[in-house]
Amino acid sequence: MMDSVQIRKYLPHRYPFLLIDRVVELVEGDYILAYKNITINEEVFQGHFPNYPVFPGVMLIEAMAQACGVLGFKTMDKTPDDGSIYLFAGIDNVRFKRQVIPGDRVFFNCKKISDKRGIWKFECVATVDDQLVTSATIMCADRSI
């Protein structure tokens, strides 16, 4: 549904911190399904860990937040070029269940559960090969810049 060129319209992030490769499904105001392909060429593997590359959990959480950002911007029909930014505002109930390694394709499924006064809340899960990797409740804030 959205390739990396279209995703960059809705996220201010750029290489090496753009963590969403493609959006597969998006229903405005409801949910997004996106993914990231993990390759050995990720810069983070130079230090995490050189002899045993594991994609950092914090990067998985950031990727979830970026997917939420795409859903939020698309739902509000806004972009960063409109002077708006979608900030990562909080996280609850984080769980890590499986390591992510080079060669994995991580799917991020994020569902909006509420939005009040510019704060949006999402239930998110990350999976690889239909196995749960990470789950979290993520909050994002729509702000003017």
UniProtKB/Swiss-Prot annotation:
Localization recorded for this chain is:
Cytoplasm
Gene Ontology cellular-component terms listed = cytoplasm; membrane
User: Catalytic residues?
Assistant: 48
- UniProt keyword annotations, A-Z: Cytoplasm, Lipid A biosynthesis, Lipid biosynthesis, Lipid metabolism, Lyase
Q: Name its GO BP terms in alphabetical order.
A: fatty acid biosynthetic process; lipid A biosynthetic process
Q: Does the keyword Lipid biosynthesis apply?
A: yes
* InterPro entries found in the cross-reference section: FabA_FabZ, FabZ, HotDog_dom_sf
Superkingdom:
Bacteria
Annotated EC: 4.2.1.59
Similarity comment: family membership = Belongs to the thioester dehydratase family. FabZ subfamily.
Q: What does this protein do?
A: Involved in unsaturated fatty acids biosynthesis. Catalyzes the dehydration of short chain beta-hydroxyacyl-ACPs and long chain saturated and unsaturated beta-hydroxyacyl-ACPs.
What name has this protein been given in UniProt?
Answer: 3-hydroxyacyl-[acyl-carrier-protein] dehydratase FabZ
What organism is listed for this UniProt entry? Saccharophagus degradans (strain 2-40 / ATCC 43961 / DSM 17024)
